[in-house]
Amino acid sequence: TEFGPSQPFKGAK
């Protein structure tokens, strides 16, 4: 998922 810990900037933005 793009909200996962791999892409925290995705979930943050």
UniProtKB/Swiss-Prot annotation:
Reported function: Adenosylhomocysteine is a competitive inhibitor of S-adenosyl-L-methionine-dependent methyl transferase reactions; therefore adenosylhomocysteinase may play a key role in the control of methylations via regulation of the intracellular concentration of adenosylhomocysteine.
Enzyme Commission numbers on file: 3.13.2.1
Keywords, alphabetical: Hydrolase, NAD, One-carbon metabolism
Subunit structure and binding partners: Homotetramer.
Catalysed transformations (reactions): S-adenosyl-L-homocysteine + H2O = L-homocysteine + adenosine
Protein name: Adenosylhomocysteinase 1
Highest taxon of the lineage: Eukaryota
Transmembrane segment boundaries: none
Cofactor binding summary note: Binds 1 NAD(+) per subunit.
Biological processes, Gene Ontology terms: one-carbon metabolic process
Similarity comment text for this entry: Belongs to the adenosylhomocysteinase family.
Root EC class: hydrolase
Originating organism: Populus euphratica (Euphrates poplar)
Taxonomic lineage of the native organism: Eukaryota, Viridiplantae, Streptophyta, Embryophyta, Tracheophyta
Requisite cofactors: NAD(+)
UniProt pathway annotation: Amino-acid biosynthesis; L-homocysteine biosynthesis; L-homocysteine from S-adenosyl-L-homocysteine: step 1/1
Keyword RNA-binding tagged: no
A GO molecular-function descriptor: adenosylhomocysteinase activity
